[in-house]
Amino acid sequence: MSKLTVCLFLIVFHFKCVTVAQEINQYDAAGKRHGVWQKNYKSSKQLRYNGSFNHGKEVGVFKFFDSSGGHPTAIKEYTTDSPFVDVTFYTTEGKKVSSGKMKNRKRQGEWLSYHQDGSTIMIKEQYKNGLLDGQRNVFFISGLPALVEQYVDGNKEGKAITYTEEGKVLKSVTYKQDKLEGPAIFYNGYGEKEVAGNYKNNRKHGLWKYYKNGQVDKEIKYPRNKIGVQ
């Protein structure tokens, strides 16, 4: 290969690199981001994110990376005819952490979180304007329920039931505006009742019954007096 050929190759290669660099991170006439954009972390050359804009609006797929590199830790997919964005979070090894939709950067509708295998559902929950709203289910790796509870505007509301891995009810409590309020029953791992009573403003209130071998063993009324004696 002649020196002239080598020089021409280097010139063409440099021109292509400059052209590619000029094609990313551009603005339109109104000063809005347009076309392909990508940014690196300040402390390194590691890519932080890449994606495309259409006159200031995100379009298509955006990928976000951890400073250590690896698989994208978040992938967001935008569509031009919908206000919702499909979002999936990953570990740097590429296993799913959670997935769902966002609107105006707030979670909306059903979101799923996954066990460490990245495929088995661990949590299924509902969001409204970024707040938990509706039924929230937590599952063991087997798929059996571990917890079923209700939310309204980000607060626990109504009955919440916790289960053992064998499917036995471990406890059933009631919430009002994120505080324990109303009936509560606690069981041992065999499904036998151990304690039952009521809460008021997050504290035990009224008569609580304590069971032994299926029978009431003692009763305590709350609140108790200062020296702790009924």
Each language-model region and where it sits:
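Bacterial Sec-dependent N-terminal signal peptides
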Residues: 1-25
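Glycine/tyrosine- and acidic-biased, solvent-exposed loop/turn segments at the edges of beta-strands
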Residues: 17-230
